A protein has these predicted regions:
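Proteins enriched for Cys/Gly/acidic motifs involved in redox and nucleic-acid/cofactor modification
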Residues: 1-203, 242, 257, 279-290, ...
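Radical SAM enzyme [4Fe-4S]-AdoMet core and its adjacent flexible, acidic
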Residues: 11, 204-221, 225, 272, ...
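Glycine-/small-residue-rich active-site loops that bind phosphorylated ligands and cofactors
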Residues: 13, 49-52, 82, 236-238, ...
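Conserved SAM/AdoMet-binding glycine-rich loop
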Residues: 76-78, 85, 187-310, 321
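Glycine-centered loop/turn positions within well-structured domains
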Residues: 107, 156, 201, 237, ...
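Short flexible coil/turn linkers enriched for glycine and charged/polar residues
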Residues: 141-144, 154-156, 253, 263, ...
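Conserved, mostly hydrophobic/aromatic
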Residues: 158, 178, 195, 231, ...
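Terminal RNA-binding accessory module
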Residues: 343-438
């Protein structure tokens, strides 16, 4: 029996792609193995968002040369954004790679494996056909949750981001296909799904028939078995009031909204090519808080973008204080070759970036704690996810708003079970609770 092992790097879209690759491999007789040493096929699904991600992948590919020497029939395949970006260069850097597969081509994995088995090594397919998004069945790794891609690509071209260059232009799956997949997942016992897209708010715009993300949200409402629908990532430019209305009236869309701002300075937002102002963003967020009951808002922020002055940074700090996010994912700007920002003047010194990041985190951590504290004494439904990675005597689950709740291990509970939890103590990043029974 042939076996396979997949390394998955990067975002949730890559995780979803790996699940679809798994299904294709198993359809022709491969079985998964947890021991990479015994695999007949090793596939690396890669990320190119940051340079250190590529460094990790090339390091792993180098380590795998030992297994290729030991097993001359071992097939080594590389797919994902790094494969799309570097293409044939990968064979030059690592000649022991057999297959390079682009972001639009995972449906061809089995035929490329057959070619390698016939002796035709160095197979490559990185064509970016934006005319159709193939419907591929997945093998979800989760027991109660599943990733559901609704589109691929991005049309935004933020000046710091490589994604449009490696994922291509936006192309959406038909509403009917997504509804069918989610309905089947609900029938199989999955109760939480996450809708995936580089920019879910531009979903359906390529159809040019009025279909948008709100249309999809309405179509997914009330599907049997599906308790929670999460979605990521949103872009403020394409978010509309009608979409927000759909999110607010849905019975299974979660209360968590992740809406990246990236900077609190209009000048920097323009340099980033984000196509919105801070004022427009605040108006959107105000409408979200009006229409989505108990909404929990998180964001992404980049500090040290080229040309960011102290005044720009202070504007970002003020935005945090004005908006009061439940959590902010903060990043130091790092150059990405192939993007306009990498060659911009006025690159910010690394030490300045580090100081700004710490200042930002200090302000946000205080806000996060202040927003979590009122949860104490309240009861929230959580879905049990399993043992805490840091403490085997504690389990954890998440609220609809994506707040993590830790509670004492309870063998009477099952992973995927929805239970009420009384919040005993709230901290900056997590809450501690007691499961309510009876």
């Amino acid at each position: 029996m042939k076996s396979y092992y997949i390394y998955t790097y990067g975002c949730q879209m890559n995780t979803a792609d790996s699940e679809r690759l798994s299904h294709q491999l198993e359809s022709v007789g491969y079985t998964p193995t947890e021991d990479v040493e015994t695999a007949d096929l090793i596939l690396l699904n890669t990320c190119a968002v940051r340079e250190n991600a590529e460094t990790k992948v090339y390091g792993r590919i180098g380590e795998l040369m030992r297994l290729k020497r030991k097993n001359k029939n071992l097939i080594l395949a590389v797919t994902g954004c790094m494969a799309q970006k570097n293409q044939a260069e990968m064979f030059k850097r690592a000649p022991h790679i057999d297959i390079v597969l682009g972001t639009h081509n995972i449906q061809h994995i089995n035929e490329m494996i057959e070619e390698v088995q016939r002796g035709h090594t160095h197979q490559i397919n990185v064509d970016m056909d934006n005319s159709v998004l193939p419907e591929l069945e997945a093998k979800p790794n989760g027991t109660f949750y599943a990733w559901v891609p609704i589109m691929n690509g991005c049309n935004k071209f933020c000046t710091y981001c490589i994604v449009p260059h490696v994922r291509g232009r936006e192309i959406s799956r038909p509403v009917e296909a997504i509804v069918k997949e989610v309905t089947e997942l609900g029938a199989k016992g999955f109760k939480e799904i996450t809708l995936l897209g580089q920019n879910v708010n531009s979903y359906g715009l390529d159809f040019k028939d009025g279909t948008d993300f709100g249309t999809l949200v309405d179509a997914l409402d009330g599907i049997p078995g599906i308790e929670r629908i999460r979605y990521m990532t949103s872009h403020p430019q394409d978010m509309t009031k009608s979409m927000i209305d759909a999110l607010g009236r849905s019975s299974n869309i979660v209360t968590h909204l992740h809406l990246p701002i990236q900077s609190g300075s209009d000048r920097i937002l323009k340099k980033m090519n984000r196509h919105y102002t801070v004022e427009h963003y605040k108006e959107l967020l105000s409408y979200c808080r009006e229409k989505i009951k108990d909404v929990v808002v998180t964001t992404d922020i980049i500090v040290g973008f080229p040309g960011e002055t102290e005044e720009d940074f202070q504007a970002t700090l003020q935005l945090l204080k004005d908006v009061r996010y439940d959590m902010a994912y903060t990043f130091i700007y790092s150059k990405r070759s192939g993007t306009p920002a990498a060659t911009m003047d006025d690159q910010v010194p690394e030490e300045v970036k580090r100081v700004r990041l710490q200042t930002l985190m200090d302000v946000q951590n205080e806000i996060s704690y202040e927003l979590n504290k009122p949860m104490e004494g309240q009861v929230f439904d959580i879905i049990v996810e399993g043992p805490s990675p840091r403490d085997e005597d504690m389990w954890f689950g998440r609220t609809s708003g994506n707040k993590m709740v830790l509670f004492p291990k309870d063998d009477s509970l099952s992973i995927g079970e929805t239970v009420p939890s009384y919040i005993d103590k709230a901290q900056t990043w997590v809450c501690y609770g007691t499961i309510q029974k009876g």
